């Protein structure tokens, strides 16, 4: 769980680092190039380094570039320079920009000149190898997350010039054992030493004007705030001193030794994530003086079984107790007006909750996935219940919706154990999936006040047998009753202004759309009435009795998932009037053996025929220009298919796992083959890729175990990740001169491949590109190659010698990696 917490925090930090809004083109300063440096000119005609493009390991940045003195290291200037081990910055530099050395994984030492005054946010973020850094006397501020994730940083000396230390500046510096805060520091952000695993000592002079340590814990004296409780402290209990008014953001975060904490009556606020991930903490009493509990304050305290919230508290922050999975009950005090988003979500042991009359709003996902919660009384004061507020509360059997509620939010009550629900007359709208998955809900009354019902609002309510749509409903999303397996009756008055039922099926009259065909109808065939122009999304979803459907010539579109999971449907004729087949339109129609697609259709949606396991053949008309992602994925009976000349692209996983597909014709019109397009087509013995194709996606032909040979056309420039991985029968492959890169694992585990000629022009061979090619005996590498990934030829048991050009980069690589090699000079290579 702690690893998950770390990963979550790391992801949040990374996203924060990368989410700087891009400047518009006119705002971007002109960049100049000098050797391996790109730079911009400042107002005083000095240079700010914008980007280093070299690959040096030990680097001394020059004093000048094209005669301009270097005075600044710009934002992200050296970010992700993985080869950089040490850097010396010239004396004229005064500022280190945001993310300047971000993720320089190999950087072990950095010397900052005396003139530097500011170290930007994320400046040395994730420099995992950085063991020491000297901060000169001129530095006044250290930015947010400046040395975050510098795990090897064992010591840091802060000079007397520093006045400001940013939020989480030394977060996760796992080797740091002690730190001294100089008297000059007057401002400190949220816990700068968060999760410093070995930090046991924070030193502050007794005369410090702002900060103090008491029993090793860092406080802000002027604000009377607890800033940091050292992560490595081993004591199991702690009492916060009297007089402290606030607990800072993440002050105790991840202090896993603590089982109990005593908070004095002087404390009025608990900061964001103040006790986050204190996983040994079993109980806590919040004193009457506290008025606010911050976002994520106790999330996730996985051992917390009880918490006392006093009446003084008026707000409970977002995620305040999220994932406190041992918490069994909670009483929200009078005075609280809102329950934040995710406030108690994932509290899996929570059995009861008391919500007072003062509460007016319950946030999004506030109690989501509280799987032990059996009963909730929502007071009449509540006027807003957020999206997913009680979703996946699988034990919740009943709940009252107060009269003040005007809308039921999306997925608000996806509660499996609901048996009945009363929707008050105040409600005007029912959101998407509002009661989705309420499997035991046998009946529901929609009041006359409701004007709109969202997509799948009552989807998969499998005990629902009938429903009445009041005349007030004028707007209805895609099949609100999709997957209701026992629904036999939808009741609509003859005078309804918008909707009507014909032979039990629900229609939208103005739109001439079939909205819902009840799942539990027992007839095996159905003819859609003439005049209907569209079949709505999931209109026939999970209608397992239907074997045949007649679609009239008036229909022009078939919606997404229209016939999803119609497992008895054996055949269907699509009329010439239809122009589009929606995503997943016939998904999992496992009995569908044949289908005729008319010339009027121009696109086949994503997953349109996915998992139609009985579909043996299909003709795609010349009108179709694109085949969507997963369009025919897992059509395991499909033996052959002809793609017409009109098609220009084959989507990702379009024919994935079509295990019986033995042949396919790709026309000259196709320019791209998507990722995994023919992945695991185990019967595919041959395929001709036309010259028009310029890109072959990742894993496009992986695990095509019968494929014996392949010719890659001249227009292709790169072979994607795992493109032909595990093609066990592949004995020969022709790579054209247009290819410049061979992706990671591109031909990995091609056990029958005996030789490969890599053409001149290829510059990179990816990690594991030919790994485990057991029969590979001959490989020639041209002079153009400048990069060979790890394990590119690993576990090639027959490969004894590589053929390389004398004095080439590949020859040096062979020497460095202990590979046997023989020479062919560049002239011989060109003759080949």
Residues of each region from the PLM?
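Bacterial N-terminal signal peptides that target proteins for export
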Residues: 1-9
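Bacterial N-terminal signal peptides
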Residues: 9-17
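Sec-dependent signal peptide cleavage junction
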Residues: 18-28
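C-terminal cell-surface addressing/anchoring modules of secreted/extracellular proteins
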Residues: 25, 828-832
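N-terminal low-complexity, Pro/Thr/Ser-rich intrinsically disordered segments
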Residues: 26-37
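Structural signature of tandem-repeat unit edges
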Residues: 36-45, 54-72, 82-95, 105-118, ...
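Consensus positions within tandem repeat domains that build extended binding/scaffold surfaces
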Residues: 75-77, 97-102, 120-125, 143-148, ...
């Amino acid at each position: 769980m702690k690893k998950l917490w770390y990963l979550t925090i790391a992801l949040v930090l990374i996203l924060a680092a990368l989410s700087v809004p891009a400047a518009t083109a006119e705002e971007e300063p002109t960049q100049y190039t000098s050797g391996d440096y790109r730079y911009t000119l400042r107002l005083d005609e000095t240079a700010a380094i914008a980007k280093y493009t070299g690959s040096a390991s030990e680097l001394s940045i020059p004093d000048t570039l094209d005669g301009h003195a270097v005075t600044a290291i710009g934002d992200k200037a050296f970010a992700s320079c993985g080869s950089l081990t040490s850097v010396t910055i010239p004396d004229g530099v005064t500022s280190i920009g945001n993310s300047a050395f971000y993720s320089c994984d190999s950087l072990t030492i950095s010397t900052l000149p005396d003139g530097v005054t500011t170290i930007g946010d994320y400046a040395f973020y994730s420099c995992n190898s950085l063991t020491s850094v000297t901060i000169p006397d001129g530095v006044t501020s250290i930015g947010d997350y400046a040395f975050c994730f510098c795990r090897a940083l064992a010591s840091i000396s802060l000079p007397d010039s520093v006045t400001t230390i940013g939020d989480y500046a030394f977060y996760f510096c796992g080797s740091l054992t002690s730190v001294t805060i100089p008297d000059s520091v007057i401002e400190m952000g949220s816990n700068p030493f968060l999760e410093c695993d070995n930090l046991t000592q924070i030193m502050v002079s007794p005369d410090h004007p702002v900060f103090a340590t008491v029993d090793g814990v860092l406080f802000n004296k002027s604000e009377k705030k607890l800033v940091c409780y050292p992560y490595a402290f081993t004591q199991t209990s702690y009492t916060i001193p009297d007089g402290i008014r606030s607990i800072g953001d993440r002050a105790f975060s991840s202090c896993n030794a603590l089982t109990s904490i005593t908070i004095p009556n002087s404390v009025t606020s608990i900061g964001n994530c103040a006790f986050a991930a204190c996983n040994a903490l079993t109980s806590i009493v919040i004193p009457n003086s506290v008025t606010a509990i911050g976002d994520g304050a106790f999330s996730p305290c996985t051992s917390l079984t009880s918490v006392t919230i006093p009446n003084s508290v008026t707000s409970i922050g977002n995620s305040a107790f999220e994932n406190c999975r041992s918490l069994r009950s909670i009483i929200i005090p009078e005075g609280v007006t809102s329950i934040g988003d995710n406030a108690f979500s994932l509290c899996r042991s929570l059995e009861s909750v008391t919500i007072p009359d003062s509460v007016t709003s319950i946030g999004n996902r506030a109690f989501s996935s509280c799987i032990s919660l059996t009963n909730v009384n929502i007071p009449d004061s509540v006027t807003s219940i957020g999206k997913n507020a009680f979703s996946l509360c699988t034990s919740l059997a009943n709940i009252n919706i107060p009269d003040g509620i005007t809308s039921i939010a999306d997925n608000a009550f996806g509660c499996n154990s609901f048996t009945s629900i009363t929707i008050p007359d105040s409600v005007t709208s029912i959101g998407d999936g509002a009661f989705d998955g309420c499997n035991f809900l046998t009946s529901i009354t929609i009041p006359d006040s409701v004007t709109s019902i969202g997509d799948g609002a009552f989807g998969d309510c499998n005990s629902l047998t009938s429903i009445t749509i009041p005349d007030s409903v004028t707007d209805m999303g895609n099949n609100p009753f999709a997957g209701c397996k026992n629904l036999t009756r939808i009741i609509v008055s003859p005078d309804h202004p918008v909707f009507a039922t014909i032979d039990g099926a629900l229609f939208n009259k103005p739109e001439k759309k079939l909205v819902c065909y009840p799942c539990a109808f027992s007839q095996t065939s159905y003819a859609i009435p003439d005049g209907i122009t569209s079949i709505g999304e999931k209109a026939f979803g999970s209608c397992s009795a239907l074997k045949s459907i007649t679609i009239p010539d008036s229909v022009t579109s078939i919606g997404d998932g229209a016939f999803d999971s119609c497992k008895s449907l054996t055949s269907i004729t699509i009329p010439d009037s239809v122009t589009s087949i929606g995503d997943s339109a016939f998904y999992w129609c496992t009995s569908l053996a044949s289908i005729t697609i008319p010339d009027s259709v121009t696109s086949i949606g994503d997953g349109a025929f996915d998992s139609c396991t009985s579909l043996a053949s299909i003709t795609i008309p010349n009108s179709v220009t694109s085949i969507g992602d997963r369009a025919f994925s897992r059509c395991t009976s499909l033996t052959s298919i002809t793609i017409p000349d009109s098609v220009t692209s084959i989507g990702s996983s379009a024919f994935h796992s079509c295990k019986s597909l033995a042949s396919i014709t790709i026309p000259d019109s196709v320019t791209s083959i998507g990722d995994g397009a023919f992945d695991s087509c185990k019967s595919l013995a041959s395929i001709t890729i036309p010259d028009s194709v310029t890109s072959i996606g990742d894993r496009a032909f992986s695990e095509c175990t019968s494929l014996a040979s392949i010719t890659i056309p001249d227009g292709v420039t790169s072979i994607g990740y795992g493109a032909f991985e595990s093609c066990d029968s592949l004995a020969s492959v022709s790579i054209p001169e247009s290819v410049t890169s061979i992706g990671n694992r591109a031909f990995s585990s091609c056990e029958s491949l005996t030789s490969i000629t890599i053409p001149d022009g290829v510059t990179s061979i990816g990690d594991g590109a030919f790994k485990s090619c057991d029969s590979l005996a001959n490989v020639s590498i041209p002079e153009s190659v400048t990069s060979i990934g790890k394990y590119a030829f690993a576990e090639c048991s027959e490969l004894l010698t590589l053929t390389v050009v004398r004095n080439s980069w590949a020859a040096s690589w062979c020497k460095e990696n202990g590979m046997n090699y023989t020479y062919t000079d560049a002239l011989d290579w060109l003759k080949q």
